[in-house]
């Protein structure tokens, strides 16, 4: 009998406790298949003045101690934001009057006057130089034009004189080569008369 009772008793496996979630066994599937395990945090046994916390599977709720996300800086390539605020009773067609110019000191007035005089003197000197140069160039151009006209007139006169000389040379050649004219060199009576001497 004792041997039969020993045979009927199943052998128990040594149990090992591992920190963390317990593995599901065949015997626990029927009892805890739809339930979630809850573990007590803190020391074993009841604590005085401190409630024990529970760890529940799922997403943890946000608390005040959670770090807040830091604000991201805007990219530098974006233009700055300009906010225009309208004041009550502002007229759209109203234009701002220009700010009055600051009063000038005596030194600034003197400097402005001297600068104006200097500018006037420089402009007058430059304009005078240009006027004199223009007059000189005009006079030189007139002289060159007169010299050119005189040269043209002299060339025309020389051309006319050359034409006259050519015509005279042709006539002399005609007279010298013509044999129809009498020889006036040997004709008697053509000699010049001699003047008689003074009468006594």
From Swiss-Prot:
Its localization reads:
Cytoplasm
The Phosphoserine modification is found at 65
Q: What is this protein called?
A: Biogenesis of lysosome-related organelles complex 1 subunit 3
Biased region (Basic residues) positions are: 1-11
GO BP terms: namely:
anterograde axonal transport; anterograde synaptic vesicle transport; endosome to melanosome transport; eye development; melanosome organization; melanosome transport; neuron projection development; platelet activation
Q: Which domain of life is it from?
A: Eukaryota
Recorded GO MF terms: protein transmembrane transporter activity
- Originating species: Bos taurus
The UniProt subunit note reads as follows:
Component of the biogenesis of lysosome-related organelles complex 1 (BLOC-1) composed of BLOC1S1, BLOC1S2, BLOC1S3, BLOC1S4, BLOC1S5, BLOC1S6, DTNBP1/BLOC1S7 and SNAPIN/BLOC1S8. Octamer composed of one copy each BLOC1S1, BLOC1S2, BLOC1S3, BLOC1S4, BLOC1S5, BLOC1S6, DTNBP1/BLOC1S7 and SNAPIN/BLOC1S8. The BLOC-1 complex associates with the AP-3 protein complex and membrane protein cargos. Interacts directly with BLOC1S2. Interacts with BLOC1S4, BLOC1S5 and BLOC1S6.
User: Residues bearing Phosphothreonine?
Assistant: 63
- State the residue spans of region: Disordered: 1-81
Modification after translation: Phosphorylated.
Q: Cite a GO CC annotation.
A: axon cytoplasm
The keyword Kinase appears for this protein: no
Provide the function of this protein: Component of the BLOC-1 complex, a complex that is required for normal biogenesis of lysosome-related organelles (LRO), such as platelet dense granules and melanosomes. In concert with the AP-3 complex, the BLOC-1 complex is required to target membrane protein cargos into vesicles assembled at cell bodies for delivery into neurites and nerve terminals. The BLOC-1 complex, in association with SNARE proteins, is also proposed to be involved in neurite extension. Plays a role in intracellular vesicle trafficking.
List all Low complexity biased stretches. 41-55
Family from the record: Belongs to the BLOC1S3 family.
């Amino acid at each position: 009998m004792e041997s039969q009772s020993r045979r009927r008793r199943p052998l128990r496996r040594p149990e090992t406790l591992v920190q963390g979630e317990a593995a599901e066994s065949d015997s626990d599937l029927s009892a805890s298949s739809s339930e979630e395990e809850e573990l007590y945090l803190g020391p074993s046994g009841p604590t005085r003045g401190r409630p024990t916390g529970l760890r529940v599977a799922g997403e943890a709720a946000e608390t005040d101690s959670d770090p807040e996300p830091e604000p991201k800086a805007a990219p530098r390539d974006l233009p700055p934001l300009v906010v225009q605020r309208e004041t009550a009773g502002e007229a759209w067609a109203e234009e701002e009057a220009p700010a009055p110019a600051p009063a000038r000191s005596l030194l600034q007035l003197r400097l402005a006057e001297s600068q104006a005089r200097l500018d006037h003197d420089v402009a007058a000197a430059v304009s005078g130089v240009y006027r004199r140069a223009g007059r000189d160039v005009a006079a030189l151009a007139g002289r060159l034009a007169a010299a050119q006209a005189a040269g043209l007139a002299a060339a025309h006169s020389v051309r006319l004189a050359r034409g006259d000389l050519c015509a005279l040379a042709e006539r002399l050649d005609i007279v010298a080569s013509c044999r129809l004219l009498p020889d006036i060199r040997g004709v008697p009576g053509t000699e010049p008369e001699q003047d008689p001497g003074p009468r006594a």
